Amino acid sequence: MNDVSKASLPKAIFLMGPTASGKTALAIALRKVLPVELISVDSALIYRGMDIGTAKPNADELKAAPHRLLDIRDPSQAYSAADFRRDALAQMAEITAAGRIPLLVGGTMLYFKALLEGLSPLPSADPEVRSRIEQQAAELGWEALHQQLQEIDPVAAARIHPNDPQRLSRALEVFFISGKTLTELTQTSGDALPYQVHQFAIAPASRELLHQRIELRFHQMLASGFEAEVRALFARGDLHTDLPSIRCVGYRQMWSYIEGEISYDEMVYRGVCATRQLAKRQMTWLRGWEGVRWLDSENPDRARKEVLQVVGAIAD
């Protein structure tokens, strides 16, 4: 698409960044001065009853700056990148029709990628194939199926853990249905996003600062009642660690503590480490991201001004 036709598209803003980088605070500050509406881009914030461990904006923040695509699923339900793209496009169209600008804020980079580039045409689930895979898993174990995937699609196997039956099963299912690997198919993009997007990423200047922010926030979550939140989820009886919700960073470690598998101190240590690993993955995505402007977490006022300099002109 050339620059002229791009300029005629409706505007949108992406505000990306690793966990604990100050994205939400900046988005709320921007909403006070720009005609924007916020859309959450976070695979954990979609779940109801998971507020503390996901650092969901509190009631006062949501009153000042409502976020769309929060609390849209029960923790027992799955939600895919395709689901997100469909829902986000609908929200963006609604916001644009009202004469405002969608500001998409979050750290789930796969969602941003799916929205920006479109999704590859993966085959629909096939209950018969899925059943056959589950039967194999019952007989041989998921480790053996992971070995099978390693031979078929080593790239996907390196990314998918043997203890992640949902994703492992899907990767095998895609191959058995289509004869093509998940890696091959995901290299084929679908429809690009029909918006002129201004992309920003916010992060601290150093890894050490980010690690400090992560550790501080994890301890703040614990002080705010994170354990009680997870105990309430545990007490439901229908949730387990194979679900994407309970595999969320922090929740998985607290779950292990509640089940008596690890001590409290070990839970804290693992929770902080897992959050750091998440931030590392997010930063890896962002460093390879094209067309992104970087903002400094440690100077939120300057970050706000930098966004306004770029975006102010499109908000008139």
Swiss-Prot record:
GO molecular-function term, one example from the UniProt record: ATP binding
Binding positions for substrate per the UniProt entry: 19-24
Gene name as annotated: miaA
Assigned protein family: Belongs to the IPP transferase family.
The protein's name in its UniProt record: tRNA dimethylallyltransferase
Disulfide bonds: none
Site (Interaction with substrate tRNA): 108, 130
Reaction catalysis annotation: adenosine(37) in tRNA + dimethylallyl diphosphate = N(6)-dimethylallyladenosine(37) in tRNA + diphosphate
Keywords: ATP-binding, Magnesium, Nucleotide-binding, Transferase, tRNA processing
Binding annotation for ATP: 17-24
Function statement: Catalyzes the transfer of a dimethylallyl group onto the adenine at position 37 in tRNAs that read codons beginning with uridine, leading to the formation of N6-(dimethylallyl)adenosine (i(6)A).
